[in-house]
């Protein structure tokens, strides 16, 4: 072996992809030390010449954004359109551990490079396909992209002002989300296949990934509360005017709203039940904004952030490509680093106490395959690509979304899991139902979706007895996961030093909002805060309107990066025998998805902003009113062939230039769409080969023919909510779903079972209940 040892040293990856999603999977693996060879046509990845800001790329050079996504890889040119091209590709596949492929299923079949074709050459290889709908099902061959999929999953429909044109999320966030889910799925299968010699097809669907990330498991409402359907909305407070700029504010919990109202001098708003919900504030937005702005406009951003932080209200500055690298927190932590090809970008979002990631390296020129590394055998983990973590024990101390979702994903890969939750202060996601029910804490789709199949024990960790039980659980855990602000684990004594002393083999994942050190260390923050501060909101909204929030994708995005980190640490433990600390801050995951803004600003001096529903990569693209009241149709044209298909369907487009006549095209499409029923026009456009979708409400996004065919919803009987649909993770392994294992647990459901497994007898468990150390009912709520 030559060169330094990284977690994936010895893993050989063939990347057959362009644009963002597949290359970002390859980037994550290359950052961890894998040898990633990018297969390109003679023309090269189109992103070699792509700049979202329209910057001129010098002849013979490559775009900075391409270089960010492809640093550290090799490049091989294969022309699949000529005789012998397929044989060249299959020769490369024969030496690979993993193939990442984003070819459309129809193209893969026509070229003879389906997963089955590739595995026939190399039965030990894992083929991870990453396509809009997956490679199976009635929609597998339909054209779609990030914009269209946002409409299909219900994200677009509910973002913006009621009665006005809704708005999609900008900045390719759906592509990043799909990549984030595909990476740990492909990596875990590859590590197991290398041990067993049996490969697999990991069939990833961007549609399913965005169901997870761009809504909060909303189809559950159809069974839990069929009459509850929230309107188009935006958060209040959110991005608000200060005296010297814009400030980011976020109130998710009732306590945060009451504290915010006290801060701005409007305590009566905090006491009014009308304003406890986002919807209530939106209904009286002018009145609420008047009070908010009277405070914010009288203070600077720094002044507001200082006092809001003291109140434990999520807050921060509003970031963009120019400002992000200069924030003191990122400077002190070394978040933004120089790229060897002349720009800056964020470092990888995960850090290790023992493992070493690969250094920043240049992207290859077209066809620069370099020298194949001689890296030795490489890591292994498990033996079954569908259950590579069988036998691994996870202790889930997480709350809300990012930590619990990372733990849930790893459990579905075969791990045993125990979730610890306090009955004194419940996981905050339990209170996010949005409607009133008896046993309200059992009715939140957000909690259900993040915690299916988990074994749950309740413990008050502020007590000595609770700490003693936790210590026993720590002694046998392979992985410990938490995502509180650092001070919480410090107060419970669950520091890295303490965990390591008890259990040197433990992998301890910590995923706080802003990291374990730095000026913002103790600030609280949700996914929406990361979107505001980290630049994602800067790409979302109409050009002449307020910046809006993606509203949640960062949690899932960060959770999947955390899952990758745990897999890397477990694989390293197979080699070293010891565990380690992982730091995976929520904000640094968000910065990966907004990295294009920093790259464009540092490379070309251009600041990216909001385009509304238009796109620099697709034209025409927009939302168009249908014949139905306030219902919209999404259309996005990326190729000349798709434009020709649209011209063949809609009269009046023949003499228009798709790049130069955007306004006139919008007029023609708008007039056509207003005469159409949404579902019918969607079907007509799809049949004509045009990427399009009717904007659905997220509550109604689950019952599609594609989801039914691929078994996306897994139904389980919950003790309180009854028959409940849960989202599968967005991939199939050799055509099969990974089982979620059951419904989300009720509060304290498995406490006796867990305590008995630790050796406590019936009398000892009864004493813990009498002392209030454990319970199956929330403290402070009267029992019926």
Predicted regions located by residue number:
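Short Gly/Pro-enriched turn/cap motifs at secondary-structure boundaries
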Residues: 66, 227-232, 237-238, 340-342, ...
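Glycine-rich beta-alpha junction loops
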Residues: 43, 132-134, 206-211, 244, ...
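A glycine-rich dinucleotide-binding beta-alpha-beta segment and adjacent secondary-structure elements
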Residues: 305, 310-360, 687-741, 780
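A short glycine-threonine-serine/GTX helix/turn-capping micro-motif
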Residues: 166-177, 201, 231-237, 246-248, ...
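N-terminal helix-loop segment corresponding to the beta1-alpha1 unit
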Residues: 1-198, 221-222, 291, 302, ...
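Substrate-binding/catalytic subdomain of NAD(P)-dependent oxidoreductase enzymes
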Residues: 189-228, 317, 321, 569-612, ...
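Aromatic-enriched alpha-helical interface/lid elements that frame and gate functional surfaces
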Residues: 235-311, 315, 620-688, 692
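Short linear loop/turn motifs
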Residues: 271-281, 319-328, 343, 656-669, ...
